C-alpha cells in the first residue's frame, strides 16, 4: 500500500470517528428514536403511571386524612359510636329494632328544636299502586344567622332492609348527619339547616314523601342527601340537580365526584333510587352523595361494621360539614358536567361543554380537509383505499372475539377480564394493521391511523353532543377527540411544509423528502430510528387519553360489575361496558401498535391464554365477591320458601340445606325471564305465631259500582298489601268511610280522618304502612263488577314481617361462603290470605 493510500484510509477513519455523535446524542436517539425498544419503554411507563395515578386518586387510605382539630376528633368518635349502635341489628321498618333506632336518635336530639313528624300520607307510588304511610321521621332545625337565605335540607334514612345491618345503607349517612348536627351546634351556620332523619326509604322513599308534606318543607331551597349503595370506600357525588348547586361541591375538603354516575341514573342503567328523586321532583335543588361499591354486599349481612372504617365515615361527614357552609347559590339550573382528579374539582354547565364540542366538531374537519387535499395533490403522499381499511376491520374483529367465555367472572375478577379482553383487542389490531402495513408502501401509515382514530372520536362526539343533557358523563370524549385530532392536525401541517424533490432534471434522483416516520422496508428512505416526531405524537396522545379512559372506565366498572348477577340484561350491559372500555383503552396506542416488539406481543399472548384458562377453571364467585340470592318465605295455603337468583346456581345451594335433606323436600325450580330462576321448597322451620285475619263487611251498590270493606288483623305487624283484580277497583279508603264514593274527587282526598284515593283507570294494589303494631287495618274500596259474575271479587292480603325467621337463619348459616342473602320482598316472611268480598 502506498503512502497516499495509507493517508487516505486514515483520513476516512478519522472522519468517521469525528462524525460519531457524543454520548448525550446517542442517548437521546436511543430513547426517542422510533425503535421498538423505545416504544416498549414508553408503553410500560404509560401503564405504570396511569394505573398508579388512578389507584391513588380512588384510594380512601391515601387521599383522606383523619381530623386533627379537637372538635372534629370528638365529632368523629361520637358519630362512629352512633354508627355502631344504629347498626347493631337489622332495623327495617317492620321490625322492633327500627323503633329502637328511632328512640336512640330522638334521645340525642331532644335538647334541640325538633319535630317527631307524625304525617300520614297517601299517594300513587306506581302505576295502579296506591300507598298509605304513617311517618315517624325525626326533624331537627338549626336556625342560621341570615334568615333571608333559603334553608338547606340534610337527609338520610335510618331504616335498613331486613337482610342487612344497614351500616353503609344508610347508617353512615345518619351518623354523618349527627356529626354535622354537633358541628353546627358549636358553629352557627349562615343559612338555616333542617335535618331529616327519615324512615322507610327502602320500600318506597316514604320518609322523603312525608317530609314534602311537612310545614318545614316550605323553608327549604336546597338539599344534600346522604346515601349508600355499597359497603364503605369513598363517598362519591352521585348526581346534582344543576350546575348552580353542583359547583359548590368544589368547596369541600375531599371532593370525589363524577357525572358518569349521574348519566347512569338518567339513562336508567342504575335502577335503584334514593330520596334525591323525591326532593328533586318537589322542586328542590341539591346533591346526592353516596357510597357506591361493592354492590354484592349491598342489602346483605355483609353490610356490617366490619367492612367499613372511620375514615370512610369521615370522608362523607367532613364533606357534608363543608357543604353546609356554602354561601349564595348560583341561579344556573342547567345540567352539570363534573369530575375530580387528585382532589381537584371541575364543573361546567352542559351548554358550555356543548359549545366547545360544536367548535371542535366543525373546526377540525374544516382545517384538516384542505390540508389533506394539498398533501395528497401536491406533496405526493400516496394513499390507497387499503390504507384506511385497517382500523375499521380490526375494530370489528376485536368486538367479535374480545369477550371472555365465563359471563359471571367479571363480578369477582374484573381486572382479569379487562386485561384479557384488552390484550385480545391489542393483538387483533397488531395483526390486522401489520397486514395493512405490509400491503401498502405508503410512508407514515401511522398518521393515517391517527386520522382514522380521530374520525372515530368525531363520530362519538357528534352522538354525545346531539344527545344533550342526559349525557353529562361523556365529557371524556371531548378530551380524547381534542388530543387525537390536534396531533393529527400537527402531522398534516408537518406534511404541508415538506419540500418535494424531483422533476425532469437528469441530475435529480426523483426522490421525495417525506414528513413523518418512514417504513423500514424502503431502503431509500431515512433511517427509522432517526425520526423523532413519533415521540411527540405519543406524548401528546397516549398518556392523557389512557388516564382519562382508564380512570373513568375503571370507576364505572367497579360501580356496576356486581350487577352482572342480577339479570341477563345486566350481564349483556356489563360485557358491553368491558368491550367498549377495552376498545377505548387501546385506541390511543393504535397508531404505534405495529412497532410493538416481540416481548410485548408475547406478554399479551400469555395474558390471553391465562385469562381464557381462568375463565374456564375459576368459580365466578368467592367469599370476597359473593353471589347474592334473594329470600322470601310465604305462609298461606302452600307454605313455601322461595329463593331467587341467576339460573344454574340456586338449586346447588339449596340442595345442601339440612332441612331439605332431612325432610327430603322437593326443590321446584322454575326459569324466569331475563336469565333468572326461582326455587321453592317446603321448610320444616316455621316462622312462629304469625297470623293474619281478614273479615268482610256488608257491601252496597250505587250507580252500578259496588262498595265493600275488609278489616285486617295482623298482630305485631306494620306492613300489609292488598291485591285487587286488575282495573276493577276505582277507589280505596283507609279508615271507616261510608258508601258515597261518587262525591269524592279523583286523586287523594281526606274526609273525617279517612284517607281516600280515587283513580278511574283502576287500582290494582294498596300498600299499607302503620306505626301501631297491633292496630287493625280498615280498608274500604269501590269496584266495577264484571258482566259475567255476580258482583263478587276475590281480594288477596299479604302481610310482611321483617324480623329474622328460622328458615332464613338456616340459609345464611349453611350456604357456601360465596353466597350472600338479601330480601326479595319488604319482609323475610309474608303471610297470605284470600277473601271473597
Swiss-Prot record:
Coiled coil: none annotated. GO terms for cellular component: vacuolar membrane. May be involved in vacuolar sorting and osmoregulation. It is found in: Vacuole membrane. Glycans are attached at residues 143, 561, 689. One of its GO terms (molecular function) is metalloexopeptidase activity. Disulfide bonds: none annotated. Pfam families: Peptidase_M28 (PF04389), PFF1_C (PF22250), PFF1_TM (PF22251). InterPro entries: Fxna-like_M28_dom (IPR048024), M28_fam (IPR045175), Peptidase_M28 (IPR007484), PFF1_C (IPR053975), PFF1_TM (IPR053976). This is Vacuolar membrane protease. The chain crosses the membrane at residues 37-57, 356-376, 385-405, 416-436, 447-467, 475-495, 540-560, 573-593, 599-619. The lineage of its organism: Eukaryota, Fungi, Dikarya, Ascomycota, Saccharomycotina. CDD domains: M28_Fxna_like. It comes from Candida albicans (strain SC5314 / ATCC MYA-2876) (Yeast). Zn(2+) 1 binds at residues 157, 169, 227. Keywords: Glycoprotein, Hydrolase, Membrane, Metal-binding, Metalloprotease, Protease, Transmembrane, Transmembrane helix, Vacuole, Zinc. Its cofactor is Zn(2+). Residues 1-36, 377-384, 437-446, 496-539, 594-598 are cytoplasmic. One of its GO terms (biological process) is proteolysis. Zn(2+) 2 binds at residues 169, 202, 299. The record marks 298 as: Transition state stabilizer. Its EC number is 3.4.-.-.
Amino acid at each position: 500500500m502506498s503512502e497516499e493510500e495509507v493517508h487516505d484510509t486514515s483520513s476516512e477513519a478519522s472522519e468517521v470517528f469525528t462524525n460519531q455523535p457524543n454520548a448525550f446524542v446517542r442517548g437521546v436517539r436511543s430513547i426517542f428514536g422510533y425503535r421498538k425498544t423505545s416504544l416498549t419503554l414508553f408503553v410500560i411507563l404509560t401503564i405504570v403511571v396511569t394505573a398508579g395515578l388512578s389507584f391513588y386518586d380512588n384510594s380512601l387510605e391515601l387521599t383522606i386524612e383523619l381530623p386533627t382539630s379537637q372538635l372534629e376528633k370528638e365529632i368523629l368518635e361520637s358519630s362512629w359510636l352512633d354508627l355502631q349502635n344504629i347498626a347493631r341489628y337489622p332495623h327495617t321498618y317492620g321490625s322492633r329494632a327500627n323503633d329502637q333506632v328511632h328512640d336512640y336518635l330522638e334521645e340525642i336530639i331532644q335538647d334541640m328544636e325538633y319535630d317527631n313528624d307524625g304525617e300520614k300520607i297517601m299517594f300513587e307510588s306506581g302505576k295502579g299502586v296506591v300507598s298509605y304511610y304513617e311517618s315517624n321521621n325525626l326533624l331537627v332545625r338549626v336556625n342560621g344567622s341570615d334568615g333571608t337565605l333559603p334553608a338547606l335540607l340534610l337527609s338520610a334514612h335510618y331504616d335498613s332492609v331486613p337482610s342487612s345491618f344497614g351500616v353503609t345503607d344508610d347508617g353512615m349517612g345518619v351518623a354523618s348527619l349527627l356529626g354535622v348536627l354537633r358541628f353546627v351546634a358549636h358553629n352557627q351556620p349562615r343559612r338555616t339547616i333542617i335535618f331529616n332523619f327519615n324512615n322507610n326509604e327502602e320500600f318506597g322513599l316514604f320518609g322523603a314523601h312525608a317530609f314534602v308534606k311537612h310545614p318545614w318543607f316550605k323553608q327549604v331551597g336546597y338539599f344534600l342527601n346522604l346515601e349508600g349503595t355499597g359497603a364503605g370506600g369513598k363517598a362519591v357525588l352521585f348526581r346534582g340537580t344543576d350546575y348552580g348547586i353542583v359547583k359548590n361541591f368544589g368547596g369541600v375538603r375531599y371532593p370525589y365526584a363524577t357525572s358518569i354516575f349521574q348519566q347512569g341514573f338518567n339513562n336508567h342503567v342504575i335502577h335503584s333510587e334514593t330520596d334525591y328523586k323525591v326532593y328533586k321532583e318537589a322542586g328542590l335543588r341539591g346533591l346526592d352523595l353516596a357510597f357506591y361499591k361493592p354492590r354484592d354486599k349491598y342489602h346483605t349481612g355483609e353490610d356490617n361494621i366490619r367492612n367499613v372504617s372511620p375514615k370512610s365515615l369521615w370522608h362523607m361527614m367532613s364533606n357534608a360539614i363543608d357543604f353546609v357552609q356554602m354561601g349564595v347559590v348560583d341561579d344556573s339550573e342547567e345540567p352539570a358536567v363534573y369530575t375530580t382528579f387528585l382532589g381537584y374539582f371541575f364543573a361546567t354547565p352542559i351548554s358550555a361543554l356543548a359549545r366547545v364540542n360544536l367548535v371542535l366538531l366543525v373546526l377540525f374537519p374544516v382545517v384538516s380537509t384542505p390540508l389533506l387535499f394539498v398533501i395528497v395533490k401536491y406533496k405526493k403522499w400516496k394513499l390507497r383505499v387499503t390504507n384506511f381499511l385497517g382500523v375499521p376491520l380490526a375494530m370489528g374483529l376485536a368486538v367479535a372475539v374480545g369477550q371472555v367465555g365465563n359471563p359471571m367472572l367479571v363480578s369477582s375478577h374484573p381486572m382479569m377480564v379487562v386485561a384479557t379482553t384488552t390484550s385480545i383487542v391489542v393483538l387483533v389490531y397488531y395483526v390486522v394493521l401489520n397486514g395493512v402495513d405490509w400491503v401498502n408502501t405508503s410512508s407514515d401509515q401511522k398518521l393515517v391511523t391517527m386520522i382514522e382514530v380521530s374520525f372515530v372520536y368525531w363520530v362519538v362526539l357528534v352522538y354525545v353532543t346531539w344527545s344533550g343533557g342526559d349525557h353529562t358523563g361523556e365529557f371524556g370524549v371531548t378530551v380524547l377527540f381534542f388530543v387525537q385530532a390536534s396531533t393529527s392536525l400537527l402531522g398534516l401541517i408537518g406534511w404541508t411544509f415538506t419540500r418535494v424533490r424531483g422533476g425532469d432534471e437528469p441530475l435529480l434522483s426523483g426522490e421525495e423528502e417525506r414528513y413523518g416516520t418512514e417504513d423500514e422496508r424502503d431502503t431509500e428512505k431515512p433511517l427509522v430510528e432517526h425520526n423523532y416526531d413519533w415521540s411527540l405524537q405519543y406524548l401528546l396522545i397516549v398518556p392523557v387519553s389512557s388516564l382519562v379512559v382508564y380512570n373513568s372506565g375503571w370507576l364505572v366498572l367497579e360501580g356496576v360489575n356486581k350487577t352482572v348477577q342480577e339479570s341477563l340484561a345486566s350481564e349483556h350491559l356489563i360485557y358491553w361496558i368491558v368491550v367498549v372500555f377495552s376498545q377505548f383503552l387501546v385506541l390511543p396506542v393504535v397508531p404505534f401498535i405495529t412497532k410493538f416488539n416481540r416481548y410485548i406481543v408475547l406478554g399479551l399472548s400469555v395474558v390471553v391464554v391465562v385469562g381464557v384458562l381462568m375463565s374456564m377453571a375459576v368459580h365466578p364467585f368467592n367469599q370476597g365477591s359473593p353471589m347474592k340470592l334473594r329470600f322470601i318465605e310465604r305462609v298461606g295455603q302452600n307454605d313455601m320458601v322461595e329463593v331467587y337468583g341467576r339460573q344454574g346456581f340456586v338449586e346447588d345451594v339449596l340442595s345442601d340445606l339440612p332441612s331439605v335433606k332431612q325432610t327430603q323436600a322437593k326443590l321446584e325450580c322454575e326459569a324466569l325471564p331475563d336469565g333468572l330462576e326461582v326455587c321453592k321448597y317446603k321448610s320444616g322451620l316455621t316462622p312462629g305465631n304469625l297470623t293474619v285475619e281478614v273479615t268482610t263487611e256488608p257491601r252496597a251498590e250505587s250507580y252500578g259500582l259496588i262498595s265493600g270493606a275488609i278489616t285486617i288483623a295482623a298482630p305485631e305487624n306494620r306492613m300489609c298489601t292488598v291485591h285487587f283484580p286488575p282495573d276493577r277497583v276505582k277507589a280505596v279508603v283507609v279508615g271507616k268511610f261510608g258508601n258515597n264514593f261518587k262525591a269524592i274527587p279523583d286523586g287523594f282526598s281526606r274526609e273525617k280522618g279517612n284517607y281516600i284515593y280515587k283513580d278511574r283507570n283502576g287500582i290494582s294494589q294498596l300498600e299499607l304502612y302503620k306505626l301501631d303494631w297491633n292496630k287493625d287495618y280498615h280498608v274500604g274500596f269501590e269496584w266495577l263488577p264484571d258482566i259475567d259474575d255476580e258482583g263478587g271479587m276475590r281480594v288477596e292480603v299479604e302481610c310482611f314481617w321483617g324480623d329474622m325467621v328460622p328458615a332464613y337463619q338456616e340459609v345464611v348459616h349453611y350456604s357456601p361462603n360465596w353466597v350472600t342473602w338479601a330480601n326479595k320482598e319488604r319482609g323475610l316472611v309474608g303471610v297470605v290470605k284470600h277473601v271473597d268480598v
